[in-house]
C-alpha cells in the first residue's frame, strides 16, 4: 500500500535545557551517592516520562517537605522553592540538595536585591505555578504583586509608584510578556527593569524555533506535559504564528490523527523538559502512517551547561 507523503519539520533547539539536564543529573547522582530512596519535593521537572524513570530508579516524589522522613536526603525541584522550605529542612536537620535552575535563582537574587533597596516587586507570571510560588516566596508576604495579563496592570495597587521593580517567570511567552512590560512601563514610568531578560535562553530559543517553522507547516505538535509552562507557551506561539492545528502531546499515543487529515507538512517541537526519545517516538509514529521526510530546522546552537552542587561532587562520608 502506498503511504501519503508528509514532511516533518523538527524545530531546533528543542527538548532538554541546561537547567532540566542539571536537575535530572542531581537526582541520578543523589541516588548513586546515598542509595534509594531519595525524596524529591514536587516533580523534579514537569515531564511524566522523566519522573516515572526516576521513580523506577528509587526517587520518591512528594508535594510537601513533611512527607519526607528526616533521615533521607531530599531534593528541591528545578522550579525553585520559597525560602521557608530550605529553612524548614535545616530546622529538621535534613540533608537537602537544591536543584533550582540557576537562571531561576538569578531571578530570586534580583528580587532580593531590589527588596534590600526598598523597592516593591511586581512579578509577571502564572498564579500557582511552582516557579512563581518559589520566587514570590523569597520575599515577605505582600512584597511581591503578581500580574498575569495586561488587564491586571490597571488594577495594581502599589505602595509607591516611584519605588517599583519587575521580574518575570522564566518560561513565559516572549510576546505576551513584552505587552505586559509595556503596560507596566506606561503606568509606572519609574519602574526598574531587569539587568538582563528574565525569560531564559531556552524558552526564547524554543519559541523562536517554532516561529521559524510556522510558515511551512499545516499543523504543529509540541511534545510536553500539560503542567509544563514552557510547553504550553510553544502551542500558543504556534497558534499565534498561524498554525491552525497545534497540539500538546505527552507521547505519540496522544496524537489526534483526525485533526491532521490532509496535512502534508507537520512541525514537531519539544518543551524544555521533554527527552529526545519522545521525539523519536513521534517520528516513528508518522513513519508508520506516511512516506515521511524529516527536515531539521535549527535557529541557534545551545552550548549552556550548569554544574551540579558541590555536595554531589564530593565522595559520600563513610560511617
From Swiss-Prot:
Record GO terms (molecular function): 4 iron, 4 sulfur cluster binding; 4-hydroxy-3-methylbut-2-enyl diphosphate reductase activity; metal ion binding
Keyword annotations: 4Fe-4S, Iron, Iron-sulfur, Isoprene biosynthesis, Metal-binding, Oxidoreductase
One GO term (biological process): dimethylallyl diphosphate biosynthetic process
Cofactor(s) demanded: [4Fe-4S] cluster
Binding-site residues for dimethylallyl diphosphate, renumbered to this chain: 46, 79, 129, 228-230, 273
Reactions listed under catalytic activity: isopentenyl diphosphate + 2 oxidized [2Fe-2S]-[ferredoxin] + H2O = (2E)-4-hydroxy-3-methylbut-2-enyl diphosphate + 2 reduced [2Fe-2S]-[ferredoxin] + 2 H(+); dimethylallyl diphosphate + 2 oxidized [2Fe-2S]-[ferredoxin] + H2O = (2E)-4-hydroxy-3-methylbut-2-enyl diphosphate + 2 reduced [2Fe-2S]-[ferredoxin] + 2 H(+)
CDD domains in alphabetical order: lytB_ispH
Binding site for [4Fe-4S] cluster: 17, 101, 200
Residues making up the signal peptide according to the UniProt record: none
Keyword Iron-sulfur: yes
Binding site for (2E)-4-hydroxy-3-methylbut-2-enyl diphosphate: 46, 79, 129, 170, 228-230, 273
NCBIfam families registered for this protein in UniProt: ispH_lytB (TIGR00216), PRK01045.1-2 (NF002188), PRK01045.1-4 (NF002190)
Job description of the protein: Catalyzes the conversion of 1-hydroxy-2-methyl-2-(E)-butenyl 4-diphosphate (HMBPP) into a mixture of isopentenyl diphosphate (IPP) and dimethylallyl diphosphate (DMAPP). Acts in the terminal step of the DOXP/MEP pathway for isoprenoid precursor biosynthesis.
Name of the protein in question: 4-hydroxy-3-methylbut-2-enyl diphosphate reductase
Natural source organism: Cereibacter sphaeroides (strain ATCC 17023 / DSM 158 / JCM 6121 / CCUG 31486 / LMG 2827 / NBRC 12203 / NCIMB 8253 / ATH 2.4.1.)
